[in-house]
Amino acid sequence: MKFALLVTSIAALSAAPLSYIKDIQPIMNKQGCTSGPCHGGAKGKAGFKLSLRGYDPEFDYRAIMTDLSGRRFNRTEPEKSLVLLKPSMGVPHGGGLRFDTDSPHYKQILQWMKEGAAFGDPVAGTVTKLDVEPSEIFVPKAGPSRQMKIVAHYADGSERDVTNLTQYNSSVPQTSEVDEGGEVKTIRQGEAALLVRYEGKLSVVPVTVLAGKNGFAWSNPSENNYIDKHVNAKLARLRILPSELSSDAEFMRRVSFDLIGVPPTPAEIRAFVADKSDTAKKRSAMVDTLMARPEFVNHWSVKWGDLLQVSRTKLGEKGAWAFHEWIRDSLSSNKPYDKMVRELVTARGSTYLNPPANFFRFTAEPKVAMETSTQLFMGVRMTCAQCHDHPFEQWTQTQYYQLTAFFGKMAVKSGMDSEEGVVYDKREEFDIKHPKDGRVMNPKFLFANDKFNVRETELRESLADWLTARDNPYFAKAMANRMWSYFMGKGIIDPVDDIRASNPPSNAPLLEALTKDFLDHNFDVRHLIKTIVNSRTYQLSYKSNDWNGEDELNYSHALPRRLSAEQLYDAVQAATGSKRKLPEVPVEAKAQDFVDPHVAKGGFLDLFGRPERQTSCECERRTDVSLVQALNLLNGGTISDSIADPEGRIAKLLLKNVSNKDLVEELYLAALGRFPQAKEMTAANEYLAKGDRGEKAQDLMWALLNSNGFLFNQ
């Protein structure tokens, strides 16, 4: 049937002369000839180079018509053209058989050649939009298939069915897969995004497959704020029941790690659990208390230090300290996010006297400055567009260099001190040129904004105006999404620094609501944080139920997250009551106080994923679990020495001669942030009674510190 549709489509068009741009290039793209692993790679393949995904049709046309002395196109005997012989395996082809001589694709290319192999009108042949049917696939259970239909509209007013020439990809093939003809098969419960691409136009079709289980009844859970409203609306539609609310002890541990980076003390847990006032009110009050503590600034300084690459390797020791203190001051004063970013992007002068200028110590090259700024502050990855038009987004190579031009005059020179940098604007002209044709690229915003103009004498100020504008559709959204990921384990758009049409949000109304709230409160990050952690969604238990066990996308239950390196180190010290001495820092210092990754380098913190701060990507910090980490927890000195510390928690409890019950309870609260269950208490009491009480207590603490309950924030 699909073959017949394609034949019919070609026959209908046969009256009109075929052109490369409208009729042949789609075949090249569909067959993968222009893909990265094939001829669209940086160096092409087997001496034949095409533009990646056909972004430069004029280049590709010349490669076919004139390269190899025209051997790819045989004007007198078209059937002997390499462009036909290779993909049909008339001669050996490294890419294998792409189509046979009886296929519609072969016949269309042959007809085009016989008609003279015209390039065509690049304007009239431009695709202006795609009609995609269905626009959404939603099925009550796995099994049904759906056939896509894609109609392309062209600049000359014509349209055609391009279903069989369209490229399809499923983001989650385990949930739904799609064949070359656009037939979508639903495989199992879940959600996927069907990416539909045709000649530079892209559309995303959401695919939802329900579990197909009977007996679902929506529980109408209470809602603390608008977050819960948007989350619950989607859960109800997907027939997913959210988990129960976390216990007070679970909440206390979770929110403490998330807000201040360290666990609550046993005394704090006891007091919070004993408070019988309204749950929502007392939790909200605890959030306020934690955010007022100095550890709040310490913890979030670590996150911003990662993103802004605070490291003495790049900034020098004095520069790193200055930048670190500026970050701390910005967080402590709750500086509006837009103001903070503006100070970074427009910074000039000494990296010692004006700390935001350190931003350009690691982005001194204009292209790096542009790529880092857009990825960090807009969640947009422009790197692909440096060499070619972005294959999955609207950004072009020309736009890449126009945006880079805002940093064209910026430079960094040495200061009075050997490690000091001075950021300045060069007086002489420094042109950013397009690599394809050498054209000088004038600064131009990535998308138009009538409120702002490019001021030639204030290029970075002009960029900052546009970047931080309230109506910039990426700036506030990227930050709202990033902050959400810190508390929920993944972004609504994930990865958080890869916002594009082909990477849609898991809950678009929720992200829009968070963004609007952030804007309505004038880029107040603390308000955004409080809103998230006060939601019932954030406070749900990590324990799943019969209806949400498979869900890892819609926030129906908390996602356990491995503690960061700094959190884990500080949690070990808090649980054991030990004060380990590390080089360069005071005995009382926590890992969250460390300015850069050179403190205690090569030890526990690096093993558990502390980043070297070489990039501004969240991906540099590792939160995986490895065998080497497990062995360190089992046998490493950080754990064993802390447990056995003669001035640590266990030693002090033994000196007080507390009962076994109180000893076990204290160790559970210190390590896991909860009281032991009855069976755990019984087992621990029996173990303590079998030998040396001190050794048994250390064994118990060792077991707790090696459990998932300690390693993960859940």
Residue ranges and their predicted role:
Residues A15-Y106, V123-V151, E159-N224, M252-R254, ...:
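Solvent-exposed helix-loop boundary motif
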Residues N29-L52, K114-P122, R381-T396, Q539-L540, ...:
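Periplasmic/extracellular electron-transfer cofactor-ligation site
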Residues F99-F119, V628-N635, I639, I643-A644:
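Catalytic cores of secreted or luminal carbohydrate-active enzymes
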Residues S69-G70, G94-F99, K314, A558-L559, ...:
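Active-site rim elements
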Residues S219-E295, K303-P583, C619-E620, S640-A697, ...:
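Primarily short, surface-exposed interaction patches in extracytoplasmic proteins
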Residues V7-A15:
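Hydrophobic h-region of N-terminal signal peptides that target proteins for export
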Residues T576, P583-V585, K590-H598, G603-L627, ...:
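Long, His/Glu/Asp-enriched segments that create or flank divalent metal/ion-associated functional microenvironments
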Residues M1-A4:
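Positively charged n-region of N-terminal signal peptides that target proteins for export
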